[in-house]
Amino acid sequence: MVLINPQIPPNTGNIARTCAATRTELHLVGPLGFEISDRYLKRAGLDYWPYVKLMYHLTIDDFCVYQQKSGGRAIGFTVRGSSSYLEYSYQSGDWLLFGSETDGIPADLLNQCDDTVYIPMAEPGVRSLNLSVSVAIGLFEARRQLGFIR
């Protein structure tokens, strides 16, 4: 799970808790809109922080170097994705990328993604879901396809 420039501490805290529950690594890519020690971030994650496998990358370039060395496909979640997250075939080692609450994934990084997916909206007037909700939806679908959910 990769968050690019997250801005809202409670969203990141909720995502950290979801990652802890699923034993999923959480990669935060700076700059962040808050300090890692932010009380709202900690509060949202409650007492689950010891279970979070957290990695911090100062810049997008730093993350890209790490991701290339580690292998796996970069899957960008964006409202302009090329296919529905439900129709996509996830593989072990995929990196699920989510952008900031206000700007999404930067265009230059989105262009480097191996694939892009979107979460369908029934109401055209609603542009997107909350970041922590979107992450949970994408993560649980990938885990379901990979056989981690029974």
Task: List where the protein language model places each region.
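Post-transcriptional modification and biogenesis factors for structured RNAs
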Residues: 1-150
